[in-house]
């Protein structure tokens, strides 16, 4: 959670440093969209290795769900 907040603060500072006159610029819009997506209540949280899961989408990156008793695991093959 602290990492997400740090990223949001950095993005906000970067958007402020570009100046208000450039607010229609693509980078500024991207930073705003990312900030909104990260802070929205719909932002999903993924779990790392061993994290509790019931579906592959609950696991971060290339991790797959091995079931509630196993948790998120590294997989060489794509998740099902």
Swiss-Prot record:
Tissue-wise expression: Expressed by the venom duct.
Q: Where in the cell is it found?
A: Secreted
Q: Does the keyword Secreted apply?
A: yes
- Keywords, alphabetical: Disulfide bond, Secreted, Signal, Toxin
Q: Chief subcellular site?
A: secreted
Question: Gene Ontology terms, cellular component aspect?
Answer: extracellular region
InterPro entries referenced in this protein's UniProt entry, alphabetically: Conotoxin
Q: What terms describe the molecular function in GO for this protein?
A: ion channel inhibitor activity; toxin activity
Q: Which family does it belong to?
A: Belongs to the conotoxin I3 superfamily.
What the entry says about domains is: The cysteine framework is XI (C-C-CC-CC-C-C).
Q: What name does this protein carry?
A: Conotoxin Ca11.3
Per the UniProt record, the source organism is: Conus caracteristicus (Characteristic cone)
**What does UniProt list as this organism's lineage?**
Eukaryota, Metazoa, Spiralia, Lophotrochozoa, Mollusca
